[in-house]
Every structure is written in C-alpha cells, then in structure tokens.
C-alpha cells in the first residue's frame, strides 16, 4: 500500500485522504475532526470493532484533543480505501517534543487520562494495518518511543513475536478483573454480612443517599468537591495533584459529561458527598478509573466500599452490563471480580536500549506479581523514599524549618487538662476542621517534611478517626492541631496508655514561624469549637509549652 510521510516542517498542509495509510499531525488532525464523513466512518469502526471501548470513540478523542490542544500535539495514522476510513491509530505527543527533543514518547490518545489505547480496523485489516502504521510512524520519527497501555482484550498481538517486530517491541500481559452483571452468583455479593454491617453503620450516622447524577448543573456544582477529594488522596498516595496542577482536567471532565461518556454516582451523608465514582462508559461497559473518591473523614465507615457495592447493585439490573474494574493488580479488585480477561502494555521503538529496558521492566513486574506484590506500589515506595531523601539533602544546611508535627512523649508530665471558657477573642482567621482545600496548601518548600509525607499523614490521621484543625493564609497552610477522641484513642497503643475514650486529646502541632504569635489564639479557637462533653486535654512537647504561659486555660493533668 502507498505510504505518505508527513513533513514535520509543514504540519498545516491541506489534508488529503489518499488511498492507503497516511500520517496526520497537528492542524491536519483538527481538519480531520472537522470532517463529518471522517467522524461517521470512525464512529462506524468504533461500534463494529470487537475490542473497541469508549476510549476509542471519536467523541473521546475530540474531547481530549480539543481541551489539551496546547499541551499535546495530536497524531492520527489512518488507512483509506475509495474515500472511506478503514482503520486508524489515534495518538498524541507532548507539545513541541517532536521539534525540541532528540527522543520522545508517543502515546495513545488520552495520555494518562485514557485507561485503554490502541487502534481500530475493519475485519481483515487488524494486523496488516497496525504493522503499516507503526512502520510509518517509526520511519517518520525514528527516535520516537511508542507507548500503548492498556491494549484491550481481543486486540491482536501475535504479530509482536514475528522476527521483524520482536526486536522492536516489549509486550506485557495484565490481567483485567471484571464484574459481569449476568453472573448468577452476583446477587450473593450484595447480601454479604460485611457489606450490610458497613451500610447500616453509615445509615445510623445520618441520612444516607446513593444517586446517579445526570443533570449537568448538579454535576458541575459537585465536581470541585470531588476534585478536592481526588487530589487529596492522589497527593497522599502518589504525590500527584491532577486537578490542582492542571485545571484543564475539570474542562475535560465537563466535556466528557456533555458527550455522554460518563456514568456519575455519588453517596451522600446528610447532604455531604462522602464517596463518588465518575466512570467512562460506552457500549454497555463502565470502566472504573475516571474519578474514584471517598471522604477520609468518614473512612472508618468504608464509604468507598459501600458506594462501590451500591453502584454494582444498580448496574446488576441490566444483565448486559459489564463493570470493568481495570488492570493494575489491585488485590481488592481481584476479590470482587466475577470474571477476568487479559489486556496488554506495548512499547515499540527503534532503540535497542529502550526495548531492553521495557523487557526488563516486564520481568520485574512479573517477579513482583509472583511474590504477591503490586509492581506500581513497589515502584511508588521507592520513588517516595528517593523524593524524601532528596528533600532532606536539600535542607541539610537550613535551620529553623518547622516540623510536620511535634512528637511528645506520652507521659503524664506532658499532659495538661484544659478549662474550656466561653470568652474567645476575635481572630483574624477562620479555623477549619478536616478541610481538604487548606490541607492541600502545605508545601515542601520551607518545611522539614515533604508535601507527600504531610498529605499521607493528614489522610491516615483522618482515616483513624482523628480530626485535623487547620488555618491557611495567602495560599499556604499556616498551622494544624490534631485531635484524637473516642475509638481513635482506643486504637492507639500509645494514647490509650494515658487517655480514655471520653477524652479529646490535642496531641500533634504544626506551625509556620510567621504564625507563632497567633498560634495561641488558634489553639484557643479550637478549644471553643470542641464539644462540652468529655475532657479536653493537651499533650505538649517542650516546643509548644509556651502555650501554658500565653493562655490561662491550662491545669496539670
């Protein structure tokens, strides 16, 4: 077949849908997306190709390409016959990478926003097209590394082992857990005692409501709260802040909703969103992995799990539905699955070094899985340790940086009981409890601990049932005080040796130097917010015993 190599210097040439396989880039792609016939043909491929899913739809590609026009350069390799689209491979590359970088990565459309990537082709062209497309791409951009993850089940991959391709490809299998709503055993899952116990516990806490959100205004109104929950957990676990770092993700989520590509459900307690799943959907499949959140403040009641089961129960009303729990090796997904299939990760490159590295990674991941360890978790743990040590090395010569929290000895001589008084001075700031937006304003710069460590500590504290009171100013977190009570004390081996379940213990403190003069007022304001029932006590290290001199509410514990 005839091949047309697109010039990097002339990306704006008139688009020509020639016979055979052609590569289109940048403005050429946007011209294709404005052609109704091209979109109709793409849509036809989307519905007819047996491995296709919502991430392969023209609607998804248009949303991503148009929202991230400045960040990513679109590439489409397409095959035409008699003016009709027969196959295509939608891709993207970081903006300007082609012109500015010696080597660069080309990824499937959607980058890390897409759970699945790959190509579409009419029957009989599934293998011949992808080999032509990749050969054309590597000829046009010889130093490119092509990354496709995950390739869906049923997509042909046997060609990778052919002599012409085996030295240029690194292929990795990933199991994919599924919940098929047609499975006759599925109803038993909704009756499990562990689920019913968690559900009833939440119901006793207040008015619990599970609902699907289909109204655009309601979806737009709730999206900021979900973005906060998502960024908070992603920041604590992976040091990622998707919405905070790139507000365009909000634009993408709105565009996908408008395109009918999202299935949105929330779980609320007394009107507050405590869990959500915003999943990409299409062709009777729902793909977990868009936005999956829960409130850390209510984590002790497992709202995320309860929401997941309620969603599965709702989907089970249509036996044609499949709930894709997505690849990745998560243990909890494997426990919930009723079926499994295989997806793939694929790297293609002219570089022997890149392929050897890719194959070594495959062997490492397989070794981790055999040992019962999740590869991405192992990699993340190493990355976190390196991140922390790099930060500490940077701060070796710096003095006076505030600690994330003090660590006083849990001894009676460090315990002070607090007399709660009604007189509370007017403060120039507002004290908030478990306020994710303020906690996300902790920055590594100017602190002993990294932001990653801080968010992890905040999250785990709330998941234990503790409260984190905080105050921010000028887009920076100024101070925090941790308060433990009830079961949070009982579950703590250290605190339970000195304190009882009825106590409210203020026991960890964080303060920026510029806020120290106001910290006493912050402390007193928190005391005023606490319930009268029970005893309020403070566990003070030497760094914070200045509070005793500044306030008259203390007495020996």
Where are these regions (language model features)?
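Non-catalytic substrate-recognition and accessory regions of acyl/acetyltransferase enzymes
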Residues: 385-494
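Short secondary-structure capping/junction motifs at helix and strand boundaries
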Residues: 142-148
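Aromatic (often tryptophan-rich) hydrophobic motifs at membrane interfaces
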Residues: 80, 85, 97, 109, ...
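A conserved beta-strand-loop-helix scaffold within acyl/acetyltransferase catalytic domains
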Residues: 22-106, 149-299, 447-509
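Acyl-group handling in specialized metabolite and lipid biosynthesis
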Residues: 120-123, 184
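Active-site/acyl-donor-binding loops of N-acyltransferases
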Residues: 2-24, 93, 153-187, 318-385, ...
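A generic secondary-structure signal for well-formed alpha-helical elements
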Residues: 46-53, 141, 230-238, 315, ...
């Amino acid at each position: 077949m005839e091949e047309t190599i697109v010039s990097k210097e002339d990306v704006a040439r008139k688009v020509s849908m020639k016979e055979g396989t052609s590569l289109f880039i940048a403005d050429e792609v946007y011209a294709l997306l404005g052609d109704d016939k091209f979109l109709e043909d793409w849509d036809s491929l989307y519905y007819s190709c047996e491995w296709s899913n919502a991430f392969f739809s023209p609607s998804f590609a248009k949303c991503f390409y148009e929202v991230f026009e400045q960040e990513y350069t679109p590439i489409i390799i397409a095959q035409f016959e008699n003016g009709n689209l027969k196959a295509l491979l939608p891709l993207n590359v970081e903006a300007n990478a082609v012109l500015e970088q010696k080597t660069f990565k080309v990824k499937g459309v959607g980058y890390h926003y897409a759970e699945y990537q790959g190509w579409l082709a009419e029957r009989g062209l599934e293998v011949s097209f992808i080999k032509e497309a990749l050969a054309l791409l590597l000829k046009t951009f010889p130093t490119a590394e092509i990354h496709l993850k995950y390739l869906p089940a049923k997509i042909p991959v046997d060609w990778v082992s052919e002599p012409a391709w085996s030295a240029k490809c690194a292929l990795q299998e990933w199991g994919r857990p599924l919940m098929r709503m047609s499975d006759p055993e599925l109803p038993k899952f909704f009756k499990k005692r562990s689920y019913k116990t968690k559900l009833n516990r939440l119901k006793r806490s207040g008015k619990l409501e599970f609902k699907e959100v289909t109204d655009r205004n309601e979806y737009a109104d709730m999206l900021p709260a979900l973005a906060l929950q998502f960024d908070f957990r992603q920041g604590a676990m992976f040091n990622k802040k998707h919405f905070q770092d790139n507000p365009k993700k909000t634009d993408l989520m709105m565009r996908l909703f408008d395109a009918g590509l999202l299935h949105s459900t929330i779980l609320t307690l007394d009107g507050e969103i405590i869990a959500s799943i915003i999943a990409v959907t299409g062709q009777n499949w729902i793909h977990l992995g868009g936005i999956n959140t829960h409130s850390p403040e209510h984590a002790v009641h497992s709202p995320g799990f309860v929401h997941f089961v309620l969603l599965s129960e709702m989907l089970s009303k249509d036996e044609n539905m499949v709930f894709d729990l997505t690849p990745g090796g998560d243990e909890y997904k494997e426990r919930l699955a009723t079926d499994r299939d295989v997806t793939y990760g694929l790297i293609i490159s002219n570089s022997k070094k890149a392929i050897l590295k890719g194959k070594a990674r495959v062997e490492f991941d397989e070794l981790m899985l055999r040992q019962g360890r999740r590869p991405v978790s192992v990699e993340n743990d190493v990355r976190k340790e390196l991140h922390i040590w790099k930060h500490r090395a940077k701060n070796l010569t710096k003095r006076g940086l505030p600690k994330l929290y003090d660590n006083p000895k849990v001894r009676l001589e460090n315990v002070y009981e607090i007399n709660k008084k009604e007189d509370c001075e007017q403060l120039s700031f507002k004290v908030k409890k478990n306020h994710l937006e303020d906690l996300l304003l902790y920055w590594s710069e100017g602190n002993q601990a990294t932001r990653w460590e801080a968010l992890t500590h905040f999250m785990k504290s709330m998941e234990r049932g503790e409260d984190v009171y905080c105050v921010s100013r000028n887009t920076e977190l100024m101070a925090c005080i941790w308060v433990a009570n009830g079961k949070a004390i009982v579950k703590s081996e250290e605190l339970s040796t000195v304190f009882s379940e009825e106590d409210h213990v203020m026991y960890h403190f964080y303060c920026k130097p510029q806020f120290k003069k106001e910290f006493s007022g912050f402390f007193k304001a928190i005391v005023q917010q606490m319930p009268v029932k029970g005893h309020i006590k403070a566990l003070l290290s030497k760094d914070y015993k200045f509070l005793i001199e500044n306030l008259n509410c203390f007495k020996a514990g």
